[in-house]
């Protein structure tokens, strides 16, 4: 259990919210970065609950950025429920998002205590940052990247949903896990990225709402006021929206493995800081 801590300062809220917005959609692990920055500059963990709540801001960025896609999928899904003749690809996509969300939903509930306490050790975060970078490189090399968006199947959705479960460990990255899974399934890099965003919507939204009461409790990390959470979510929204646009443009003509070139040195740096006592795990 995290020891009771002081309330968060505004500087801390702003810095962590910018970090959240920048890293939530990049395959570098937002939870890992928040954990590292909190410990390095403030000497304590902001907490999994604070992280989950400010993710609601970045979640809103996804909803706005993909509003047309989401609306098309939702209307097709409801139309398909009412009329079998209207069951097109978007109708099936609705079911794929639901099916892909079930694994991480079950894992999140069953492993809640483990996620909030044991998994947040910085030695684990640093190690995973390095090891999962190798998965990125392997996914890029093994994946044929030939399958388009309309070639997605229910099997793909479930398998990518299982990959998303790995993101419960700080250092993996939600997008990193699901996109890697998509590449191993031979999906085009941009297709895997777009579906990764859609797949994250229910999971992140549920996680943020579920963690909202705990975000005010110092026992769950540092306590934040309602206004701080609101401002933090707003910052996360703006920075997150920019991050989404940049990532989709980047992956269209750049290897996913480039992120490993950032993650591996970061993991080694964190290990060095832990080993020398500059940071506590």
Curated annotation (Swiss-Prot):
Sequence intervals crossing the membrane: 95-115, 119-139, 152-172, 195-215, 227-247, 256-276
Reactions that this protein is recorded to catalyse: di-trans,octa-cis-undecaprenyl diphosphate + H2O = di-trans,octa-cis-undecaprenyl phosphate + phosphate + H(+)
Leading EC class: hydrolase
Keywords for this protein: Antibiotic resistance, Cell membrane, Cell shape, Cell wall biogenesis/degradation, Hydrolase, Membrane, Peptidoglycan synthesis, Transmembrane, Transmembrane helix
Compartments where located: Cell membrane
GO molecular function: undecaprenyl-diphosphatase activity
Membrane topology term: Multi-pass membrane protein
GO cellular component terms listed in the entry, alphabetical order: plasma membrane
GO terms for biological process, alphabetical: cell wall organization; peptidoglycan biosynthetic process; regulation of cell shape; response to antibiotic
Matching InterPro entries: UppP
EC number per UniProt: 3.6.1.27
First-listed, main subcellular location of the protein, grouped into a coarse class: membrane
Other remarks on this protein: Bacitracin is thought to be involved in the inhibition of peptidoglycan synthesis by sequestering undecaprenyl diphosphate, thereby reducing the pool of lipid carrier available.
Entry function: Catalyzes the dephosphorylation of undecaprenyl diphosphate (UPP). Confers resistance to bacitracin.
HAMAP family: Undec_diphosphatase (MF_01006)
Family indicated by similarity: Belongs to the UppP family.
UniProt name for this protein: Undecaprenyl-diphosphatase 1
Source organism of the structure: Corynebacterium jeikeium (strain K411)
């Amino acid at each position: 259990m995290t020891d009771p801590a002081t309330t968060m300062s505004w500087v801390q809220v702003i810095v962590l919210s910018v970090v959240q917005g920048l890293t939530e959609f990049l395959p570098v692990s937002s939870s890992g970065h928040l954990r590292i920055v909190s410990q390095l500059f403030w000497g304590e963990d902001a907490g999994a609950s604070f992280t989950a709540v400010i993710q609601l801001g970045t979640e809103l960025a996804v909803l706005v950025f993909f509003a047309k896609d989401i609306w098309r999928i939702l209307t097709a899904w409801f139309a398909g429920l009412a009329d079998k003749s209207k069951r097109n690809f978007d109708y099936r996509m609705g079911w794929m998002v639901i099916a892909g969300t079930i694994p991480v939903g079950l894992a999140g509930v069953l492993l809640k205590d483990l996620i909030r306490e044991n998994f947040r050790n910085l030695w684990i975060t640093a190690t995973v940052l390095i090891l999962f970078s190798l998965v990125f490189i392997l996914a890029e090399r093994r994946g044929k990247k030939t399958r388009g968006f309309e070639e997605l199947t229910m099997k793909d959705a479930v398998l990518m949903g299982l990959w998303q479960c790995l993101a419960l460990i700080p250092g993996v990255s939600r997008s990193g896990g699901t996109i890697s899974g998509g590449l191993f399934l031979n999906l085009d890099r941009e297709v895997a990225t777009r579906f990764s965003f859609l797949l994250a919507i229910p999971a992140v939204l549920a996680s943020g709402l579920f963690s909202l009461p705990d975000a005010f409790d110092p026992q769950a990390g540092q306590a934040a006021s309602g206004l701080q959470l609101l401002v933090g979510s707003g910052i996360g929204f703006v920075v997150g929206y920019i991050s989404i646009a940049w990532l989709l443009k980047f992956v269209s003509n750049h290897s996913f493995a480039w992120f490993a070139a950032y993650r591996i040195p970061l993991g080694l740096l964190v290990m060095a800081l832990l080993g020398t006592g500059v940071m506590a795990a």
